[in-house]
Amino acid sequence: FVRACAEAGLTFIGPDAAHLALFGDKAAARTLAERCGVPLMPGSAGAVTLEEAQAFFAAQNGAGVMVKAIGGGGGRGMRAVLQAADLPEAYARCVSEARAAFGVEGVYVERLMLHARHIEIQILGDGKAVMSLGERECSLQRRFQKLVEIAPSPSLSEKLRHEITQAALAMARDVGYRSLGTFEFLVDEGSSELPWVFIEANPRLQVEHTVTEEVTGLDLVQLQVAVAAGRSLSSLGLDPQAPPASTGYAIQLRINAETLGADGQARPGTGMLAQFDLPSGPGVRVDTHGYAGATPSPHYDTLLAKLVVSSRSPVFADAARRARRALDECRITGVPTNLALLQAIVSRKEFD
């Protein structure tokens, strides 16, 4: 599509075709990370057969593996495997999901990091210079799909924040990255062997860009459009050597139209939105396509709204309290949602 835009004389707002191809191939992204000296989980260099995946699993001495689609994303085409007997089914399902969702069947394998936190670095480049706009914590997930995102991470040490940010910048510089991009990492600060590793890069604007906007005061969509129009970072008043500081904390809560079965499996919720009243006020932002009378389609993403709260306080618990109040003010009827799940998450003492 990007090449077709160029051939038609149109400017695609986003990375160029080469960067989309590179980061759309997770195995190629691993190769880039290796070239830049960025830590990786032990894994295959490219697509593997089931027999090769089984041999890799056996070599991990019980650590388990992640089976991932080379062209996957959004939590699809991924399976964690802890028992050898489960590997054939996981492999087959990843291949099937990858074929259906992305048109690519290849899968690769990595050692499983059991106690990982998910940290991502927001990058902006103009083709010559690149800079970091801070990190986001996306550890609260269900079946590898994000539910709650936070900026900046309240759990990351300054040492690891610096190391991970520099790794993301090194990879972006190596390819002369242009546009917005997100470099994603797994972190286990308790590990002496691999406290953090690169997992993938997403060459696009992320759903959770909102929390970065709230703590930096930057409009990421506007910046992406400006870079696509040929503007440099310096012409936009941005200095890669002096990235914008974060103020306080922001939390994004994904309100989905879904039901949660007894088996823990989420399924799309259907019906007509009879009531759709979401909170407003200082420190509360809502991005949504929902409205009373709407009938969300069960055939696409179940996301109804992004509820984003922010606090300028340096104490994360203050933002967490605002999140609890905002969720309590939501009134949605007619379609089942995950509001109760989100309320349960932010009410746990571990969340503060």
Where are these regions (language model features)?
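Residues within well-ordered alpha-helices
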Residues: 1, 28-29, 53, 341
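Short acidic loop-to-helix transition motifs that present clustered carboxylates
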Residues: 45-52, 114-116
